[in-house]
């Protein structure tokens, strides 16, 4: 494969199903704070392979609309939805987060994980404004991203960009809270910690022992080894630790 393969696509190819910076633990915090129930209408932006949407539909029986720009991810999501018999609960389509194809005040909950980090600040604001638009009054926005800590932000950003082959723009905790508040959201609550995406403990928690062994086995293949080692080293660097932030905001 190409050496410049985008990080989340690379990890998915290795067999990783949880592709969020705080892993299942952060996603579970969002779900616990999201007020999900059978009668709620949910939008997942950047639904990827449908892992979170499928979990929500199974747990709560809610109807979920999923959007993503990646046709390959959507094809995998559709296959996963059908394999779980959830075609009546989940619908996915290709759409841009900054121009959502939905009417105003259409959803009770919008969930968007590991995407806003990838956008420049102005694009972040456009996407968040769209989430605000399609949410019903008092609706909840649930997000999950990379958070900057410490003082050496430039080194962290450079290391991340080299590791995942994508230009990223994570923010500090105050930066994330501020961008949601500036967009009109209130009651902004956060949960944060060290990134667990590629930590041994986090991988086992997210993927199980056998899933983790499968990922490691694939990672050690000659064509994957260099990029995996680079990502593993960056994501577990003790001097430039990467953090996640999960945010629950109300319209």
Swiss-Prot record:
Keywords, in A-Z order: Methyltransferase, Transferase
Signal peptide: none
Gene Ontology BP term (one): methylation
Name of protein: Uncharacterized protein HI_0095
GO terms of molecular function: methyltransferase activity
Keyword DNA repair: no
Domain of life of the native organism: Bacteria
């Amino acid at each position: 494969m190409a050496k410049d393969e985008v990080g989340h696509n690379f990890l998915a190819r290795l067999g990783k199903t949880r592709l969020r910076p705080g892993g299942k633990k952060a996603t579970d915090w969002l779900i616990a704070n999201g007020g999900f129930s059978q009668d709620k209408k949910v939008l997942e932006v950047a639904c990827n392979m449908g892992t979170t949407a499928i979990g929500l539909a199974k747990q709560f029986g809610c109807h979920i609309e999923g959007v993503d720009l990646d046709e390959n991810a959507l094809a995998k999501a559709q296959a996963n939805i059908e394999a779980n018999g959830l075609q009546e609960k989940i619908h996915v389509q290709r759409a841009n987060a900054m121009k959502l194809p939905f009417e105003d005040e259409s959803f009770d909950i919008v969930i968007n994980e590991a995407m806003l980090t990838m956008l420049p600040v102005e694009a972040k604001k456009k996407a968040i404004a769209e989430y605000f638009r399609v949410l019903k009054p008092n609706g909840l926005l649930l997000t999950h991203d990379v958070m900057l800590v410490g003082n050496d932000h430039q080194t962290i950003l450079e290391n991340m960009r080299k590791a995942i082959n994508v230009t990223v723009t994570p923010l500090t905790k105050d930066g994330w809270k501020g961008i949601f508040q500036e967009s009109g959201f209130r009651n902004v609550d956060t949960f944060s910690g060290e990134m667990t995406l590629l930590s041994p403990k986090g991988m086992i928690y997210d993927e199980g022992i056998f899933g983790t062994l499968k990922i490691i086995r694939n990672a050690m293949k000659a064509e994957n080894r260099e990029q995996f080692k680079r990502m593993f080293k960056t994501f577990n660097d003790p001097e430039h630790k990467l953090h996640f932030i999960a945010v629950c905001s109300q319209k």
